[in-house]
Regions:
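Predominantly soluble domains enriched in secretory-pathway, periplasmic, or organellar proteins
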Residues: 1-171
Length: 171
C-alpha cells in the first residue's frame, strides 16, 4: 500500500487487495450474522444512538464515499451510497469519522487534502455537506465532545507517510 494513491486507485488488481466487506455481528451470541459488500475500503463505522434508530454511517477511504448501513424490509443489512467526500479524483483519503452526540452530523477528516468536512445526516439517506475547513497537512483523527460543543482533530497517520514537522491537535 505504499504506492502513489492515484495509481493505486486506478489499478484494479491493487484495489482487490483492500477490503470491501462489512460483517455484522450478534455480540450476545458472539457470531457473525451477515457479510455484505461496501466498495472502497470502509474504515470506521458510527452508529446512531438515538432511541429507535438502527442505522450507521461508514466512509470508504479509497472511493471517498459516505455509506448508510441499514437493514432493509427483509431484515438484510445493506449499504447505500449517500454522499461523496471532496473530489475523489484528488484522492481526499477519508481516514476518520465522528458522529455528533445528537446524531445530526457526521464529521469526516481526510488525510489526502487535510480537510475536515461536516455532513448533515438528519435524513441519513441524503447526507449533505454543510461545512468544510482546511485543517492542515495530514488530518487524521476526529472526535466530538459529549456535549456537541467542540470538535477535536489531530494529524499523523502512518510514520512512513507523515511529513516532518506537521503534527498537531486542533480544537
Amino acid at each position: 500500500y505504499m504506492m502513489d494513491m492515484g495509481k493505486l486507485i486506478k489499478d484494479a488488481e491493487a484495489m482487490k487487495r483492500f477490503g470491501a466487506t462489512m460483517v455484522m455481528w450478534d455480540l450476545k451470541a458472539m457470531k457473525p450474522t451477515q457479510a455484505f459488500s461496501v466498495p472502497g475500503s470502509p474504515l470506521e463505522i458510527r452508529w446512531s444512538l438515538r432511541e429507535g434508530d438502527n442505522w450507521a454511517i461508514t466512509a470508504t477511504a479509497l472511493t471517498s464515499k459516505l455509506w448508510l448501513v441499514k437493514q432493509d424490509a427483509k431484515g438484510e443489512w445493506q449499504a447505500k451510497d449517500v454522499g461523496t467526500i471532496g473530489d475523489p479524483a484528488k484522492i481526499p483519503l477519508p481516514v476518520d469519522i465522528s458522529i455528533a452526540p445528537d446524531d445530526s452530523k457526521i464529521y469526516v477528516n481526510s488525510y489526502g487534502d487535510g480537510t475536515l468536512r461536516v455532513y448533515d445526516v438528519t435524513n441519513p439517506f441524503e447526507g449533505k455537506l454543510i461545512h468544510q475547513v482546511k485543517l492542515g497537512e495530514q488530518a487524521n483523527m476526529v472526535s466530538t465532545s459529549w456535549d456537541g460543543q467542540r470538535v477535536y482533530a489531530t494529524s499523523s497517520l502512518l510514520s512512513r507517510w507523515d511529513k516532518p514537522g506537521d503534527q498537531w491537535l486542533k480544537a
